[in-house]
């Protein structure tokens, strides 16, 4: 005969059993366990009794042999509540929930089928038995309005509403949180996350191995392994491994970045020794065009501006060149006319030489030199003066041509530099898309929901033509507190985050 059983609700007409009734505090409705379905033979291994107190009904599973030892109690949702030293465990079983709902429907004459079997009872009891004997060391919860929580060897939460998690973790001030071995949150509302992270200032945050915020740097934030907000650097933010802020209201962005003055966002990074103080540079990509005087200008804006200057200069050079050419042609024509007028002479009817203008007959000057030898010196002087003017005009033309050539070379150099900057912008654009894809992937990671359990989660993300993979783990300490960490990878780059969740 099969050992399988099904809890079946019996009314007073089934198997001659009596349904007991009475007041809420004393009411017990018994449910029997048949040994085999449909044969009318009822076993005596288990008994399910519905008990009530203060209007809260539960189902208690007992062994019917001997003393009827109580195995466990579950509510109408199928939850088994186990209370330990400061810790409450909840076991939920769908079959128990199914049974409780079936019990309620039986009163209304509805179907009495359900899924609770003897194997379900044994499985739930084994879980209850194990949790009742589980001991968690290094865990402390102080009840009351100033409750504090500490978890880990030598962990200490001494501030009001403070939390210390990890070996040697310290949360000394009100609302302080320290998570990680030897992490210390020593300022009011301060948060220290990571091994050896120190948040000494009020309202400060230090996240990452050995991340540090000095006690005088109020509102300081240091995120990244060995990131540091130094003395008196109030409201400073160090983001990146070994990033350091030494100035007020300044931001050190990127690994090894170090600020140089107050109210500054600095992305350069330290490359030399302490005495050398050599700094490298980074490219800030993915920017919109600046619209205010205090905004940063993009290379695209500069390209358009330089292009406009180039077109304007080119147009001006063309106009000036045309003016110079017209002026030179005009002056040359005038000189030619004057020269021509002065290389002929008029001859009167009596053979006297006159000016060529208006003369009926003219002859070449050379022909008239025999008769006018006394005037040769004056004519030579006039011709020499004309030649000097022509020479000066020629020199002016050559000078303008050289200036045009120099301007052309300068424009070519600007064009080469702009091409180099455009290539750098394209590379930065790809890097920003990878960062966006990593951020999207990290956002897809789930945090843990079940108390006392770790979870492992993975997610993918993308932005434009870039993709990223993120993986993470988490742990829920209780219903109010959980922590998780994740890392994302994309084309050789990686980013990470660590978070802690408090629910009030």
From Swiss-Prot:
Residues 297-342 are annotated as: Right-handed coiled-coil (RHcc). Residues 27-453 are extracellular. One of its GO terms (biological process) is protein secretion by the type V secretion system. Residues 281-296 are annotated as: Neck. Residues 454-504 are annotated as: Translocator domain. Keywords: Cell outer membrane, Coiled coil, Membrane, Protein transport, Signal, Transmembrane, Transmembrane beta strand, Transport. Residues 1-26 form the signal peptide. It is a multi-pass membrane protein. Residues 27-413 are annotated as: Surface exposed passenger domain. Encoded in a prophage region of strain ECOR 9, upon UV treatment bacteriophage containing this gene can be isolated. Homotrimer; can probably form mixed heterotrimers in vivo. Will form mixed heterotrimers with EibD; these are correctly located in the outer membrane and bind IgG Fc, although less well than homotrimers. In denaturing gels runs as a band of about 200 kDa. Binds the Fc portion of immunoglobulins; binds more than 1 Fc per subunit. This is Immunoglobulin-binding protein EibC. The gene is eibC.
């Amino acid at each position: 005969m099969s050992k399988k059983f099904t809890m079946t609700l019996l009314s007073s007409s089934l198997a001659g059993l009596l349904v007991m009734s009475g007041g809420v505090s004393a009411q017990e409705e018994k449910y029997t366990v048949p040994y085999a379905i449909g044969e009318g033979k009822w076993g005596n291994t288990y008994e399910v009794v519905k008990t009530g107190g203060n209007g809260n009904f539960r189902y208690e599973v007992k062994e019917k042999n001997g003393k009827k030892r109580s195995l466990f109690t579950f509510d109408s949702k199928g939850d088994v509540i186990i209370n330990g030293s400061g810790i409450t465990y909840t076991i939920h079983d769908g079959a128990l929930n199914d049974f409780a709902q079936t019990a309620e429907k039986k009163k209304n004459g509805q179907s009495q089928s359900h899924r609770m079997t003897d194997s379900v009872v044994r499985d739930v009891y084994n879980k209850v038995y194990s949790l009742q004997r589980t001991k968690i060391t290094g865990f402390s919860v102080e009840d009351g309005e100033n409750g504090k929580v500490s978890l880990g060897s030598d962990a200490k939460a001494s501030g009001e509403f403070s939390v210390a998690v990890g070996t040697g973790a310290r949360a000394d001030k009100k609302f302080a949180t320290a998570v990680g071995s030897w992490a210390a949150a020593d300022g009011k509302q301060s948060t220290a996350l990571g091994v050896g992270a120190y948040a000494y200032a009020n309202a400060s945050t230090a996240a990452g191995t050995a991340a540090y915020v000095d006690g005088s740097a109020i509102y300081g934030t240091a995120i990244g392994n060995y990131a540091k907000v130094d003395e008196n650097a109030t409201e400073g933010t160090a983001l990146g491994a070994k990033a350091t802020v030494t100035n007020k209201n300044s931001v050190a962005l990127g690994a090894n970045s170090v600020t140089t003055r107050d109210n500054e966002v600095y992305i350069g990074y330290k490359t030399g020794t302490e005495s050398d103080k050599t700094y490298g540079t980074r490219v800030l990509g993915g920017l919109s065009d600046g619209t205010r005087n205090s905004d940063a200008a993009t290379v695209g804006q500069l390209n358009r501006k330089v292009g406009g200057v180039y077109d304007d200069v080119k147009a001006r050079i063309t106009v000036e060149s045309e003016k110079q050419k017209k002026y030179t042609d005009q002056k040359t024509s005038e000189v030619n006319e004057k020269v021509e007028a002065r290389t002929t002479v008029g001859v009167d009817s009596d053979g006297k030489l006159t000016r060529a203008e208006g003369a009926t007959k003219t002859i070449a000057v050379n022909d008239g030199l025999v008769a006018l030898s006394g005037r040769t010196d004056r004519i030579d002087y006039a011709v020499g003066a004309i030649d000097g003017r022509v020479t000066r005009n020629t020199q002016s033309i050559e000078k303008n041509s050289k200036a045009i050539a120099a301007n052309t070379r300068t424009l070519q150099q600007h064009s080469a530099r702009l091409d180099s900057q455009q290539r750098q912008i394209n590379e930065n654009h790809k890097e920003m898309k990878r960062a966006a894809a990593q951020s999207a992937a990290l956002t897809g990671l789930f945090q843990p929901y079940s108390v006392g359990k770790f979870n492992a989660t993975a997610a993918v993300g993308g932005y434009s033509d870039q993709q990223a993979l993120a993986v993470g783990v988490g742990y829920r300490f209780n219903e109010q507190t959980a922590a998780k960490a994740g890392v994302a990878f994309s084309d050789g780059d990686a980013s990470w985050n660590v978070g802690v969740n408090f629910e009030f």
